[in-house]
Amino acid sequence: MTDALPVREETIFAPASGFGRAAVAVVRVSGPAAGPALDQLAGGRPEPRRLSLRRLRDPGTGNILDQALVAWLPGPATATGEDMAELHLHGGLAVRAAVLRALGRVPGCRPAEAGAFSRRAFLNGRIDLTEAEGIADLIDAETEAQRVQALRQLDGALGRQVAAWRETGIELLAGAEAALDFADEGDVDEDGLDAALAGRAAALRDAIRAALADGRRGERLREGFCVVLAGAPNAGKSTLLNALSGRDAAIVSDIPGTTRDAIEVRCDLGGLPVVLVDTAGLRETADVIEAEGVRRTHHRIRSADLVLHLVPADGEAGPEDFAEVPVLRVRTKSDLPSGAPGEGGLAVSAVTGAGLDALLDAIQGSAASALGGGDALVTRERHREALSRAAGHLDRVATAPAGFPPELVAEDLRLAVRALGEVGGHVGVEEMLDRLFAGFCIGK
């Protein structure tokens, strides 16, 4: 049994297109054996970066597998930074399976795991970690605003800004360490150096804090604007959820307490991701299971971006307090004879559709105000946490009192630079790489 090759010496291959039947199937190969794989299957390597029509043959039997377009992409100017090859096959399942089996028999080649190509691009410096996250977000994007935000990340919007901040931090650190080295020189104006260092640290801190002061728009856009439907039992929450989402997502019944657990439905409202959440009716109950549902309802309300407080048109609002989050009062069942609209809120009928367009417009307006148009720099909690730490260290430098030990100033600057490096994946991120790339598609 031979020893396993180091990761950088292995060659990986995988379909880069969907797994179903299609007109064309694309197979990618990356690594030092990509060229030899073409030699064995395609009879040689075509001119670099030009598609060439070739007969693909099984290297073991010589049998023809397919007539395909092949491309030879020598590194390092490739997506992964390595030698690469692409095989554009006919999209039949049997054709693709036969070619993948043949590639598996090429020495040094093995099937790729999820995210393996993007991981190699990151490890070889073709993309930074924020751009890799942009790829993941683009794959997961369900709405136009999510697509726009993901493309900004993939284009390096955050990565370039953080790299510039990190470069400034490195310059400050170099100045602080130089001041330490020449501290014994009598002609050094230590007070002037300290003031200049504090001023530049404050400016860098303020720039980072400005990016953080965005109301968490980036994270909320990735996760979806959360709208919780809350109210007493039989207020029409499940019926309204089904009407707003256009499908029977929740069970509707006249029996109070039918909904016990939260039901989520993801929607696209004007290109914005919205998550509608049906919840258990709010009331005092001796039923242990229903009481747990009510407890979970209160938890969802506290974490919501918007609460739709549903009250039947002929009912009372009740004593519920939703002061912690934005609330929109909705008068339901306006089609009933007794449904004279009460004061305040939007009157809707999930049965006739009356008022639903106005309600959707109101939800979309709230989502647009909260999420923006995909222009946020910070899109993940990981970014926010690292940038907050960097700003904290810079704040200590900027506000250090006279006589503060210069060694501690330098250490704070060093920690700020390290925190900024974590955002782009330059330091301290090994433990989260597996989680990130495991969420990618095979062949990405």
Swiss-Prot record:
Record note on cofactor: Binds 1 potassium ion per subunit.
Keywords tagged on the record:
Cytoplasm, GTP-binding, Hydrolase, Magnesium, Metal-binding, Nucleotide-binding, Potassium, tRNA processing
What family is reported?
A: Belongs to the TRAFAC class TrmE-Era-EngA-EngB-Septin-like GTPase superfamily. TrmE GTPase family.
Outline the extent of the TrmE-type G domain: 224-368
- Which species is the source of this protein? Methylorubrum populi (strain ATCC BAA-705 / NCIMB 13946 / BJ001) (Methylobacterium populi)
Q: What is its main location?
A: cytoplasm
Q: Which residues bind K(+)?
A: 234, 253, 255, 258
Gene designation: mnmE
Report the superkingdom from the record: Bacteria
Which protein are we looking at?
Answer: tRNA modification GTPase MnmE
Briefly state the protein's biological role. Answer: Exhibits a very high intrinsic GTPase hydrolysis rate. Involved in the addition of a carboxymethylaminomethyl (cmnm) group at the wobble position (U34) of certain tRNAs, forming tRNA-cmnm(5)s(2)U34.
Q: Which GO terms describe its biological process?
A: tRNA methylation; tRNA wobble uridine modification
